[in-house]
Amino acid sequence: MKKIQFFDTTLRDGEQTPGVNFDVKEKIQIALQLEKLGIDVIEAGFPISSPGDFECVKAIAKAIKHCSVTGLARCVEGDIDRAEEALKDAVSPQIHIFLATSDVHMEYKLKMSRAEVLASIKHHISYARQKFEVVQFSPEDATRSDRAFLIEAVQTAIDAGATVINIPDTVGYTNPTEFGQLFQDLRREIKQFDDITFASHCHDDLGMATANALAAIENGARRVEGTINGIGERAGNTALEEVAVALHIRKDFYQAETNIVLNQFKNSSDLISRLSGMPVPRNKAVIGGNAYAHESGIHQDGVLKNPDTYEIITPALVGVDKNSLPLGKLSGKHAFNTRMEEMGYTLTEQEQKDAFKRFKQLADAKKEVTEEDLHALILGQSSESADDFELKHLQVQYVTGGVQGAIVRIEERDGALVEDAATGSGSIEAIYNTINRLMKQDIELTDYRIQAITAGQDAQAEVHVVIKNDKGAEFHGIGIDFDVLTASAKAYLQASGKSKTASKQADFEEVK
């Protein structure tokens, strides 16, 4: 039985999804959940890319105790040095170095010859090997690279000290047959194939990321890279939950085992969906809302008689609990904290106290507090505590058929209160115009989404927004409240605050 390692890049490649920006606290929360999930390697970020990313990688390296943490680096000594510094507190640090090997990338992006690329690989892998015990090399755009040159580049990296070779399908170009053949070619040509770890990193542009990853495993790969829910730039990445469950359900075929704790997938998926603002499609394999629903009468009858008739995956396998009991206003701290742990949250003692206080307030307003309410409660607490701006007062003047007005008062992190007013063709526009005046930013709203957290008239509203600033950068915000307008204001204020903070950091870097 072969052992397959799981390499999660939700915090690096997943964050490249337009509009997804995790702050440090959110990244640590995700990393801790990935650790509970049994992920072998967490790619925490790209340390050289920005001071913020460096600090995130550093914080995650310090927080994670039971799996490896890695950082991305180009074939540049400064990148490698920065990664080493960020990962110095990691229990098991690794580094992930990449350089393109396809002709189109070498000619138009790198402006390097094949000989120069090989020389760079040799030098920088050797340099990194002096600092890291585990060095992973990725020949970017491998699936569009000349096969003979790709093999030469891989051999060069191994000879220089690479311990892991990752084969990226960077633009989602290949198919399972071709990708499997590529690994067969590598096995045939690379003399050390069985002595090091080969991995795959697939994108989903043609909808074949999971199938390609499984084809790689069939043909010798012992590490799979991907993200939770398959998030990532463009069409996304290999969805790790799909690969893990496929290996488990079809163990007879793949003859593979993993360290993954399968019943933590639902918690992981929910957490990342809420923090990223990307809802999981209801028909998504493994963790979608309809994954275990049966509409057909014939199917329903069969499942009732024997679930094996139409269910190859049980909900409990991935942590979907259909019998979760709601909490209420009489529930105590022990029951509340136990439920938090079951849902995958790791809270400090103070965070537990704050969360329980908010829970009691929520329980007074609702007859039953469901798991969805609890996710929203923790998410709201986490996001609001990290914000530089807090909504203190909102007043909307509504006239049917007329111009709407809004008055907004916010508190800045230093305690200063500022207030302004503006109008709009609707209540939401009036609120957002007012916040734009307060924040003194040129902001474009690119996405607005509202959903009820639970059913019933006492449901809380959860609003997600994505904005774009004048530099073209996108930021996500979330707001939760019983009042839709208040939730909308909180979401927009949070996204605007992220944009303002990012602009300040960019200005600082430019001056420095």
Swiss-Prot record:
Its cofactor is Mn(2+). Residues 4-266 form the Pyruvate carboxyltransferase domain. It is found in: Cytoplasm. Residues 390-512 are annotated as: Regulatory domain. Pathway: Amino-acid biosynthesis; L-leucine biosynthesis; L-leucine from 3-methyl-2-oxobutanoate: step 1/4. InterPro entries: 2-IPM_HCS-like, 2-isopropylmalate_synth_dimer, AIPM/Hcit_synth_CS, Aldolase_TIM, LeuA/HCS_post-cat, LeuA_allosteric_dom_sf, LeuA_bact_synth, PYR_CT. It catalyses: 3-methyl-2-oxobutanoate + acetyl-CoA + H2O = (2S)-2-isopropylmalate + CoA + H(+). Its EC number is 2.3.3.13. Mn(2+) binds at D13, H201, H203, N237. It comes from the Bacteria. Pfam families: HCS_D2, HMGL-like, LeuA_dimer. PROSITE patterns: AIPM_HOMOCIT_SYNTH_1, AIPM_HOMOCIT_SYNTH_2, PYR_CT. One of its GO terms (biological process) is L-leucine biosynthetic process. Its main location: cytoplasm. The keyword Amino-acid biosynthesis applies. Keywords: Amino-acid biosynthesis, Branched-chain amino acid biosynthesis, Cytoplasm, Leucine biosynthesis, Manganese, Metal-binding, Transferase. The keyword Amino-acid biosynthesis applies. GO terms for cellular component: cytoplasm. One of its GO terms (molecular function) is manganese ion binding. Homodimer. Catalyzes the condensation of the acetyl group of acetyl-CoA with 3-methyl-2-oxobutanoate (2-ketoisovalerate) to form 3-carboxy-3-hydroxy-4-methylpentanoate (2-isopropylmalate). Belongs to the alpha-IPM synthase/homocitrate synthase family. LeuA type 1 subfamily. This is 2-isopropylmalate synthase. It comes from Listeria monocytogenes serovar 1/2a (strain ATCC BAA-679 / EGD-e).
